């Protein structure tokens, strides 16, 4: 697989040259492969959201480069708008950005600005709605008549309709109830698997990241603390705790069982993995305790 995004010595400074100067991102270098689903974690203020906003030119680096398909996105500043079609950004609580008369028009807005029209536009809108689980009957409704979860899905569909090469999701499940979180996460996973586009998922939920991410970016105090496969990151629980982060709850439970002498594997990150690991023990012993 080819490299779709490369960050070279990337830094960003808020309030540069003032008494309030703060280096939010400090000398970050990494490469992201086409088709990966990358999780992004870090405590509040770690720099993860600032880093994501530099990927599509919403923020311009103080130092370093963002390379998209091998080209510096700031090579031609007047064309930075084109980068934002290729790297789609979904902010936290994106439903507050809905504004059109109908859900259909809202989803179509970005794709129209990219130049789609006619049947191609209609197909893009309906495919994006399908990916995010919006029923066709909702498309002619006002977006303000939708439920909270439906608004969230409509806003995400508007970015998906542009067919970005890279989709950046900043806390997409924030504020949703457990069912809404589950539905949205499943739809993001389906989109990634079927479209083979690169997805970056920022989340405070270690459980969500553990379920879907191929690799994880860990940010701490503006620096890149780790960028490793998911199992490797969560294997380093002591290090994560120093960054104010935790391993998934099910991982803690399985580690406790190992300490009690039960023959369960290391690196269990999800409930499904735990079920597969514990079922043979239950069948053999009849009970755990």
Which stretches of residues belong to each language-model region?
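The feature captures the beta-strand-to-loop junction immediately N-terminal to the Walker
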Residues: 41-43
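Conserved ABC ATPase "signature" region
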Residues: 119-137
């Amino acid at each position: 697989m080819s490299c779709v995004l490369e960050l070279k010595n990337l830094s960003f400074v808020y309030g540069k040259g003032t008494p309030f100067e703060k280096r939010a991102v400090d000398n970050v270098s990494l490469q992201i492969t086409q088709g990966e689903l990358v999780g992004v974690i870090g405590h509040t203020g770690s720099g993860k959201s600032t880093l994501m906003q530099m990927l599509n030119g919403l923020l311009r680096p103080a130092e370093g480069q963002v390379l998209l398909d091998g080209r510096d996105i700031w090579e031609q500043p007047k064309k930075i708008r084109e980068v934002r079609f290729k790297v789609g950004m979904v902010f936290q609580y994106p439903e507050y950005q809905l504004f059109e008369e109908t859900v259909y028009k809202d989803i179509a807005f970005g794709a129209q600005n990219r130049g789609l029209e006619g049947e191609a536009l209609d197909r893009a809108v309906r495919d994006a709605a399908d990916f995010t689980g919006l029923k066709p009957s909702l498309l002619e409704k006002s977006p303000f008549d939708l439920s909270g979860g439906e608004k969230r899905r409509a806003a995400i569909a508007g970015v998906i309709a542009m067919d970005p090469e890279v989709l950046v999701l900043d806390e997409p499940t924030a504020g949703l109830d457990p069912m809404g979180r589950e539905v949205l996460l499943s739809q993001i996973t389906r989109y990634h698997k079927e479209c083979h586009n690169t997805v970056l998922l920022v989340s405070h939920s270690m459980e969500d990241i553990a379920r879907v991410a191929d690799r994880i970016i860990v940010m701490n105090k503006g620096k890149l603390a780790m960028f490793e496969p998911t199992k490797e990151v969560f294997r380093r629980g002591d290090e994560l705790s120093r960054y104010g982060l935790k391993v998934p709850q099910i991982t803690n439970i399985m580690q406790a069982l190992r300490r009690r002498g039960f023959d369960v594997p290391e690196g269990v990150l999800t409930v499904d993995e735990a079920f597969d690991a514990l079922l043979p023990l239950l069948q053999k012993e009849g009970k755990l305790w």
